[in-house]
Each structure stands twice: as C-alpha cells, then as structure tokens.
C-alpha cells in the first residue's frame, strides 16, 4: 500500500491526532505530577521529576527527527513507574505518526520551552469582546423576546423612583462608612436596603460576593452576608399556582395533607411540606408572584447602570456588561423549576453509588416551571454541627470535600450555590424519625380511609419528629388523636453521617478546554510553579491588558505566592486564602478570566472554609489528587474511544468509497460493452440491407 493510500485511510483520523496534542499537554503533566506529589510529601525527588520531564520532551523531539522510538523511550524513563512509561510510549508513537504525516511543527518550536508537561503549547485564541449590547438587546438575549410586555418605560420609570426612595437613606448617610465607630451600622443599613429591594437586587449582591476577580475585598466580605430569607406569599397564591400548573387540579386533589405555613421563603420561591397521594412526605416549591417579570424589570435597570458606567475608559477592562448578562441568564434559570428538576436528576445519577451524598428526588409528574414537588430529606443545618464541634465533623469534612471534587473534576457538573444554608446533615437518628414520619402519615391515611379529604386537618408541627419524644419503647401521639402502640428503634448502631445538598437551580459547567485549564492551574499550585501558573492565567484569559512590565510583576508576585505552597506540606496549604490572593492579583493587573472559572474558584474557597471549620487538619490539595487523576483517566479513555471510533468510521467510509468507485467502473465497462454491441448490431443491419 502506498503512502498516499495510508494518508487517505487515516485522513479523518489525522484531525483527531492534531486535537490529541491538547490532551497530551494536559494528561502527561497530570499523570506525572502524582509522582511529584509523593516526592514533595517526602521532601525528596523533585529533581527526578524535572529530569524525567526534560527527558520526556527530548524523547519527543528525538521522535520528531525520525529516530528509533522504542529504544529512546526505554532509555529516558528511568525513575518513572510503569503506568507513566506506558503512556509515554503510547504518546510517543502517536506523535511519531502525526509528525510524519502532517505539517505540524509545534514540537520544533517548543524545544526551548521548559514549562512542566508542555509538549505542545495550547494557545487559546483571543476572544473578541463583542460590541456592548444596549439594555433592550440584553433583555432580548436573556428572554428571547425584545417586545416583552414588562419592559415598559413607564413601569421602569416608576420602579426607578421606588428604588430611589428605598436607597435614599443609604446614599445620604454614605460618608458614615468612613467613620470607624459608625461604619458597621451603615453597612448593615445598606444590606437591609438591598434585602428590601427585591429578588434581583439580593441575587445581584450575592453574585458580587462571588466575583473577587472584579470587585474589592471589602465589598466581597460585606455582600457575602446577604441572605435570601424573604417574606412569603399567600397560601391562596400557592393554591392558584398549583392549579395552573397541573391542569386545574387543586391541592386537595394532589395531596393528602398540605401545610399552609411555608417551611422557608427565599428570594425566588417558598417551600411547603406535604403528603402525596401515595404516602410520600414531600416538599412543594412554588415561585413567588411575578418573579420572572420582576427579575426582567430589575435586570433592565441594573444592566442600564452598568452599561452607562462601562463607557468610562477605566471601567472597560472589567467587561461588566458581559458579566451582568451572564448573571441575568443565571437568574432566569433559577426561576425555571423544570430546569432545577433536571439538575436534581443529573446529580442523583452522578452520585447513585455514593450513599453518603443525598439530593432530593423530583416526584414526577408533579413538576412544572412554576411548581416543583420533590422528596422531603430531613436533616440538621451543617452550622449546628460546626457550632457544637460534633464528633462527626471530620467525617463530614471528608464527605463534603469528596463530593465537591467529584462535581468539579470528574462530573464537570457543579452546584453553584453552595453555602451553609443549602447543606444539611443526616445522622442515624434522622433516618429513624423519617421512618416514623412516613408511618404516621400512612397510618393516619388508612384509619381515615372513609372520610372525605376536606374533613382532615393534622395540627402538628412541620417536622413531626420535632414533637416526638426519643423513646426506645413506645410513642403515644396525642396531637393527631392516634396512638401508635409500638414503634421500636432498631437502628441504634452508629452509622456514618450523610450530607444533603439542596437548591440546585444554579449549576456550573466548564467546556472541556476550560476544564483542562482549571486542572492545569491546580497542577501548578501543587508543584509550586508560580510563573507557569501566571502564564496559564494570561494565556487562557479572555483579555489581559498588561504592559510588559506589569506582566513581569504579575508573574513575579504569582511566583512568590506559589513558593508558599512549595515550601509547605499539601495538608497545611490554605487553598481558599491562596486562591483569593490569586484572584486579587488577577483584578489588580486587569487579567479578565471566564466567569465560570471564577465561580469554581469561589466554590472551592467556600468549600474549604466549611471544611476547615469542621476539621482544621483538612488538606484540600492532597485530597484532590485522586480526583485529578480520575478526571484525566476519563478524558484519556474517552479520547481513545472517540479516536478509534472515528478511525473505524473513516476506514468504513474509505471502503464504501472504493466500492462505489468499483461499482462505477463496472457500470462504465458494462455501458461501453453495451454501446459496442449496439454499434456492431447496427453495422450488421446496415450491411445486410
């Protein structure tokens, strides 16, 4: 077979091989850095890692000059384990093929590049920042309808006047924020003003607290205190929402019992406890009145202000209108409860083999855009365990850390609204009381089977187990008028606690390339390579407006930060504080990073903060290593699968093309034979005549 035929055979596969450079740049460093982790923990072996990496790159350059692949690989992998050696050999063979059959000269250009694991530079093309959308175009972007009835200038004007009156006390007393004895009172006034301004403004303040790459530390600290406990709406509106969502069926048609008093009320929705017709204790989440139209109206005002300020030259680098646009989209997603139900399904699927992590389950068909019915998951707020220094705390810290690392590094599907209010803890006692709760409801339903639904009313608290005396023998309930003669607590053996994650309306997903970048940054943190980490941030930034001198300063200061990691054990590194300082440098030197990237960093900071309160000895970086490796194995295996699938497809396509060509040739031959035969017959006929 000629070289040309070989090239044709793998022509579609060649594209995959070119893309393979992205994986090898990431995978090689991740497969190798695990060895470096062990060496750092033992305070030895750093040089072996660097020497191995240097030989690894020389080996690839050697392959690029068409020398013997196998002998060179075996001679330059001293000190590496068998797995690393195997992957090095595999990657070398791929590169040998790629460089012999394409015009890829990237390896030649990287001979003098000493960055760790950098076989082929991945230079992310600069994303051109689009022209600023005006406020009306921005609304169209988040709702898909420019002619939205709520975007009415008269209504907007009235709302602006209303907000002006609400904000007036804070504006007039603004100088007080500089007076030491009074400034805390002023900040408290501002926070309460934002709370009173409505859903969008509360969420806007919370969003600001998650972007230390854009806003100063003081603002981040103060706005992180905003909470979403808001006034509840009427039970009548809840009933109307349920009827409108489920084909006119009322609460009495869908539930055996429904608590009219909400369990909690947030900025977007409120939740009630109920009992479904099949005897399941459930939570019913109902959107507040006009929440979507209010979000769109207030978003229009916020975006208009930011859009006006963005024309100031000093503000342009922030690209705030783009960030606010992403904020608006996330707000609209949180107001779609069908989407939240799909998120719950995804999380339950991702953690189906992990019994220590629990997400509520949507109870179909009782799911709509305005109403979501999900399983009731009893538990205690995680802050209760932090305050009393419970013996479960170290276990809880490990469970939470593992869950978040799986979301971020393996599943690439991350809960983006993690705060203590959205995390509950369930112990074995909670499981017992949940069983009592369900049995109580079922017994009540069976005993009153002949009664009409409107006749019953259960006068007990929302959490039934709060009213139950913890007895190992019997329990008599006078509140419901029913006596449960014997409820035995058989599960008194100690079991590991479980974490329950709530409110998953907002999630974060990174593209594959951004995910690889995030993992690369983690790798450089572990290795203590500050300058390489700075180069990563600049290389993958959406925009970096640094002069050469500023870029040099940025790299030097990053190097100083990373040296702190290099000189410490991984278990002693405070990742949250470290990443906060990184984002501070990003803001100071005007390096614009992706919003999802910043969200993940903030999630990591919040997670470590909770984890350290539960277990001060928690080491986030050390615990992340298995998940980093697992994510790379998944990426690598998916690539291999995809590569061979595409190669098989291209081979099949080539065979089909060859068969088609053969068929065409045969058809042409048959046509020629028929034409010749017809001509001969015609000549014979003429001759006979």
Curated annotation (Swiss-Prot):
Residues 655-683 have a biased composition (Low complexity). ATP binds at residues 263-271, 285. SUPFAM superfamilies: Protein kinase-like (PK-like). It is an enzyme of class 2 (transferase). GO terms for molecular function: ATP binding; protein serine/threonine kinase activity. GO terms for cellular component: mitochondrion. Keywords: ATP-binding, Coiled coil, Kinase, Nucleotide-binding, Serine/threonine-protein kinase, Transferase. It comes from the Eukaryota. InterPro entries: ABC1_dom, ADCK2_dom, ADCK_kinase, Kinase-like_dom_sf. Residues 257-689 form the Protein kinase domain. The active site is at residue 417. This is Probable serine/threonine-protein kinase abkC. It comes from Dictyostelium discoideum (Social amoeba). The lineage of its organism: Eukaryota, Amoebozoa, Evosea, Eumycetozoa, Dictyostelia.
